[in-house]
Amino acid sequence: MGVQLKLDPNSKNWLRQPDQQPIQDSICTLPGPGSLLKKKIRKTEFRIDNGLLGNTSPIINVESKIPFHRRANSTPEESRKRVSFSLTSNDGAKSDRSSQKSSNSRKSIRSQSRSRSSSVGSDSQASIQSGTNSEVVSDDEEDGNFASIPELHEDNEYHSNLATSSNPFSDGSSSKSASLTASSAAASPTVSFSPASTSENLTPTSSKSLASNTSLVQSFNSASRSSSISGNQYTYNLLGKSTDESPKITISAGTSMSHFPSASSKLIQMRRHAHMNSEKCDPELLSHNEYFPMMKRGFISRFLCLFVSRDANVYIGPLESSHAKPYRPFGSFVSRFTNRVASDLESQIPDALEAVLTQNNDYDFNSFLHNMGYSRCYVDENYHITIHVSSYERRVEFMLAVCEAMMLYGSPSHKIQQSLRIASRILQLPATFLYLPDCMFVYFKKLEQYSPDVFVVRVTSQTDLNRMVLVNEIFRRVMRDKLSAEDGTEVLRNITSFRPLYRDWLVAFMHGVASASILPVVYGGGWRDMLIGFVLGLLLGIFRVYINPRFFLFDSLFEVIISIILSFLGRAFGSISRYDKPVFCFAALVEGAITLILPGYVVFCGVLELQSKNIVAGGVRMLYAVIFSLFLSFGITIGSALYGWMDKDATDADTCMSIIAVSPYWYILLIPIFTLSLLIVTQSHPRQWPIQMFVACCGYVVYYFSSLHFGASQISSAIGSFAVGCLGNMYSHFIKSSSFAVVLPAIFVLVPSGFAAQGGVSAGLDTASQITSKNTTTNTTTVTTENSQNSSLEFGFTMVEIAIGIAIGFLASSLTVYPFFGYRRKNMML
């Protein structure tokens, strides 16, 4: 760790007239993006008040390299020394006025600086005080005051460097001198710079001639620093010689009260890094073990760390900073049960950050929506980019990053192309786009200074609702001139570097919960079937989460292999009988196990693409969904046939007995459980859970009662999707956010219902029965006319019919909502 202090008078505003007022907007300069976690050197610039040094106003640059992680073996009895910097005058009135103005320093920081920083109490206080005037300046705005809080451990070195390229004290003032003081809670360690009041060596001529000798670095070794805890002072001469005229650096170290980082302060650091970091952050530095030491964790925090790979509030940190609000689901519990005393740092910074990122705290409704996480686009309206200052390369890079992120996290293709067209118009980049599944061709037309370029973006899509919302919000901010294209690209890089929100074992476990909870509701299973359904679903989750990503060859045949295994085990359990009656339902077990890998979402996106006149992408997706369904049907057939060859008395029932059916009143509990498991599998943030569960439950209620009247699956799916689409469109109108992530879980709830109504597993079971029959010789491609309804091809057509009904319902909802609220194409579903 090193802290370097240098005087830099080469500033445009360093000479001012006595009658001029201090330049408020130049008090603190924002440094460029950097990584605090990677221990980069960050710089804070403080402007000295006009009354301190007469007519001159040099800049003091404070550079610090701070170890982000604290030592794990630290004890409460260990003394910690914290250093922050303040400028005071050494005249006779210092002792009287500094005490009066130090109490007002925190208020002055908030009033004079509209940045994401604030004063940090007795642990870290940055102020500029003088005998006549005072300006309070905040610490490093980009680091959130952490760059000016170094720690003096025994294994670190403390450097002090004062370098001058010209004489800043040539005004002839003999009654004032500058003092740079480091304050602490207990015995204050000080770092003071005291130039001589009158000296021939401080003339501009002599200082230029001694420019090569004005840099001096002194270090404390571990022995001297450990013995200086009682308050010993160290004095170093600026020019390397001990004279009365040469400026000196005086450092006195003292003990301070023990202080340990609380969870909130660590979360603030993570949020600040995620917001401003320009490079991909190290995933290992963003784990719970780094921010909540085991010795200080409470039971609740340890328990939550088993389920989430990082704190949920930090994960959504690049867009919002509601630290001190009671609506955060995980962070509040973690902070509350860590057995730490909140410091001034964690109690003051959140308010300043919240005041900056919210548009107007006077509007209770908007503040409530912001705090609940439904809309994270309320920022300071005074900040706009009216002219795009980003270069051509940066704008192109942003468009490609947005395209890649949207494709990666499962955004619908028509939404991707529409967003890219809007971006090309606002960013003044004429471009043409051609989308194919998992591939986007971007052609930038020729401009005056640039030649035409063609880019191909190819990624494998996955469903991540949390990061889908984050990418959409970043895109909206850039399009509304809240962020520049360069800053938007940096935040997108941070988002893509994040690990999944939930741990792998939890995702695999929720596969089992989803299978068990959907069995009685959709497929007619009983309570006994739920246990076996959980085991089969857990097996699917293990293969999908652990085995599939690690073996490339297995990935190519994942659907066939897993359907064979599940069908084999399902028929084995279904063949268990008691008193000549089956104990378990074979059809419910198999259909419930493969629920989460049904291609309903793929077909739904294909139908939306066909409706948006994207014939190529829509046709490819529809064909892929049919082939995918054939894979599942083939696997079910092979698995059932394999067990049929082993057990001649294997069950042939493709439906469940009505006597084992669960009462419909239990659906009130089982549908929310199934929806919650879907939200965790799709990596949805807890802030999104309430509205997503509400929409999904409403959609199923409408589907359930409509199916009692109409019976046909296509009509019931269309009516249920109509209700879901209306709720999603109203959400996008009032909340001003994309509704696709809200209605997507409802689609996953509607697809299994229609799939069961069409008898999805009956095709494979019927073919398997024909294969194992003693009197019939057939194969999987031989289908008679009377059995055409149960053919393998019907399995794929079933998914197409369901998806068409859902898509028609969404289109009808858009047409219905339009007369009442207008058409907001950038937010609505279609």
From Swiss-Prot:
The keyword Transmembrane helix applies. It is a multi-pass membrane protein. Residues 100-130, 186-199 have a biased composition (Low complexity). It comes from the Eukaryota. Residues 10-27, 200-210 have a biased composition (Polar residues). The keyword Transmembrane applies. It is found in: Cell membrane; Cell tip. GO terms for cellular component: cell division site; cell tip; plasma membrane. The chain crosses the membrane at residues 505-525, 529-549, 551-571, 584-604, 622-642, 659-679, 691-711, 715-735, 740-760, 802-822. One of its GO terms (molecular function) is amino acid transmembrane transporter activity. Keywords: Cell membrane, Membrane, Transmembrane, Transmembrane helix. Residues 1-28, 70-147, 186-210 are annotated as: Disordered. PANTHER family: DUF1212 FAMILY PROTEIN, PHEROMONE-REGULATED MEMBRANE PROTEIN 10. Belongs to the ThrE exporter (TC 2.A.79) family. This is Uncharacterized protein C16A10.01. It comes from Schizosaccharomyces pombe (strain 972 / ATCC 24843). The lineage of its organism: Eukaryota, Fungi, Dikarya, Ascomycota, Taphrinomycotina.
